[in-house]
Structure formats: C-alpha cells, structure tokens
C-alpha cells in the first residue's frame, strides 16, 4: 500500500540539456495520469551532477514544459509542502539518511581509489564475467574506518546489497525478476559528497509521497536498486510503470541525435502545443475507443497508464534513413535541417492539420503572430490578432496547413500590389509555346465565370486544359506565372479563392502589359 491514497507522480529531469522527445513523453505521461486520477504532478530538478548542470538548461526545461501545457502542482516557482524541489538544496536531507544507513550497518564507507576500481573492472573483463564490486571494505571495524577518516582518505558510501530475488510487478512491462547478487554493493554517496542518482531519487520520492513512478523502459534496470533502498529506509514502495522504447521509421531505437531534438524546435517549426501533446501521448498509449485526435482537455480526462503498451512506439516525424547508418539530419539544432528531414505524412502533421482546423481561430492567430513579425511583405497593421483581413485569410487557408510556418506565404500573397516577373524562366512560361494561349483562355473563362472555392478553380483550369490541349506543367506554369510572377509557390487552387476573381484578372492584365502578351477583348 502507498502512504497516500492521492495519486502523486513526478518528473525529475537533469538540467544538462534540452527537454527532448523521451523526456517530454515521460513528463506528459506523469502529468496526464495524475490529472486523470485527480492527483498531483510534481516537478523536481535533479542537479546533483554539478559538472553538467546549468542554469540555462534549467530555464529551457521549464519553458519547454510550460509550452507543452505540462503544469506542475508542486516544484520550482510554485513551491509545495515537500520542498525544496531542487536536489542540490536537499543535501542535508540525504546526509541525514546516509548517517541512518551507516549506523544500521546497511551501508559502509568505501575507500577504494578510482584506479583500484578500474583495475577490478579490467580483471572482470579479462575473465569474461560481469563486474560486481567485491565488498572489500564492507566489514571494516569502526576503528579502521575512523583511522582512515583521520588520514583524510577520500571515500564514497556504498549500500550493502542483500542477496535475494526481487519480483517487480510493473504496470506496463508486467512481472520482471532480478537477482540482486548480480548488482553488488552500489554507491549511494559519491566521493564529492553528492548522492548518486538512485539514492537521491528514492529519498526524494519517499519524502514527497510519490505513488507512481512512470518513466522510460531504459530505467527498468535501476528499479531493483531503488526497491532495496526503499526497504532499507522503511518506506512503502511506489508502483512502477516503464514506458516502451521509442523507435524511428526504420524500426531501430531512436538515435541519440534524433532523440535529442529539443521539443522547442517543434514550436519554432510551427506546431501547436496541443498538437505535440496529442502526438506524444500516442507514443505507447491508446484510448479505449481507439480515437487518436484528442483535442482540448480530453487527454487529462481519459489517460490511463494501464493502457500503455510495452511494444516499441514509432516516432515517425523524421523520414526513414536511406542507409543503415545514415542520419536524416546531421545537426539537430538546425531548424532548416530539421524541417527538411520532416516526414510530410507523419501522424504529427495529420494531428497538426486537424488541430489548426478545429482550434478557436483567435488561438490560432495568437500562435501565428510570431511567424509574421519578420515578414516585410506583410503590412504592420495586419500583424494583429484582431485584424479582420488576417482573420479572413487564415480562416480560408487553415484547412490546408500542416503547421503555422506555412501560413505567412498565404498572408503575404494577398498583399502583393506590384506584381513583377521574377525570372527569365517565368517569362519563358508566358511567351513560349502554348503559354500565351493558356493565359488568354484562363483570362477569358475566369472573366465569364464566378468561381469561389478551390474546387471551382480546379474545374476552371481543367476546362482551360480541354480547350488548349495542355496539361500538367504546360497548363499550370503559364497560369502561375501570369497570376503570381513566379515559377513556384503555393498551390493555385488554394491561392486563387484567397485572392478572388477581380484581383486575379487585374494581375493577369498587369502581366500582359509587362510582357507584351495580348489578351482577347
């Protein structure tokens, strides 16, 4: 039984880098389960590795969680009953429990040097057996220990591991058996006085009354050490749930490089937090009715860690590598490279399109504004969530968007007033071959019809193709050149309803004057 009936989960990142894909999923699963059970979600910062922990990383992790909508009930910035919530501020607490374990002979000081330990490891390797610490100092007398302490000899503190079989009933992985004799006496306090990961985690989880430890399957091997420490300290053991491995499109474990992609990169690539939350929740979990698009606060209501699968979950955001050792992206901090490596048919894009379509328009505009600010081809007065023209444009095109970075080009196209032919190639599409005939027919048919929707314009262009005998590039490129001045850009059936009939006719007439193409009267 747990110490409290209230479900209490936690996320305990190390502030030594970005919040990456695996960490984000762990945080989300803990948050969602706590919310669905009416419990509390705690954020704790594990900064005992002082060589790697940085203030910048700490700030980025908090920013990432806030963007994702994973708001903590207790932790940094908000406080709580069981603080402090930063491990480096809890050293006196760990010291107190270390003294208790030493006094009860459940732990001992180890005076082995790093060189001696390395020699033992090499000896085990040479013998072809796993390295297990031999407990050299486990039975030293108090007098011997005090003598070494007087000499100022550095030491670590090791837990005296009892030999037994541990059976763990993991919520996701099922029954898992461990033989503790294969673990050996492990370090709980390092020679610098800081607690080891496994030790600090247990003390903190116990004192913060954590009822469920939800984390990646890579941490399963830490669980027996932690259970032994819970037992030694006399605390109830929480329930464990180890989420499935995340693999890439090639079915292999997500590379450290791909997996290290900051989730803020997806924000900067135009994905809404609602979308990314939805996508991450589906990496190893399914709803009872099989639905995948779960907008608003549905996830908080229905998420159940007992419905997580132990089968690997596929992170399909990046394209499948062509070669076995090839990375699709070489620099996972470069937004351009990340964008180019994105899989256009990913579930993330499908969810993103659904979210952008269904989300309240004011929320879409609010998230879109940062992507408009640097665009000089969009009037300043339009860059406002209350601007009716911007609202109208985004309402018209959002059904076509996979992410918000695609929207500024649509907005900018609406405000083109001085249409200019961009290149010799574009002029060629207008003047060569059947180009003039295609432009004339499009102009005439458009002038005598009243298209409104993308389907209307598709049908109109099909009619132009039938009359001129042109299709594909020889049909669309002259029309694109005459209406946009470019040889590439937005899909015409999407763009044309946005511009409207009158603006299109005006653009063709201007192009005609600029290039000398005569239009039928």
Curated annotation (Swiss-Prot):
GO terms for molecular function: ATP binding; glutamate-tRNA ligase activity; tRNA binding; zinc ion binding. Its EC number is 6.1.1.17. Disulfide bonds: none annotated. ATP binds at residue 256. A motif ('HIGH' region) lies at residues 13-23. Gene3D superfamilies: 1.10.10.350, HUPs. One of its GO terms (biological process) is glutamyl-tRNA aminoacylation. A motif ('KMSKS' region) lies at residues 253-257. It holds the Pfam family tRNA-synt_1c. GO terms for cellular component: cytosol. Transmembrane segments: none annotated. Monomer. Belongs to the class-I aminoacyl-tRNA synthetase family. Glutamate--tRNA ligase type 1 subfamily. Catalyzes the attachment of glutamate to tRNA(Glu) in a two-step reaction: glutamate is first activated by ATP to form Glu-AMP and then transferred to the acceptor end of tRNA(Glu). HAMAP family: Glu_tRNA_synth_type1. This is Glutamate--tRNA ligase. It comes from Leptospira interrogans serogroup Icterohaemorrhagiae serovar Lai (strain 56601). The gene is gltX.
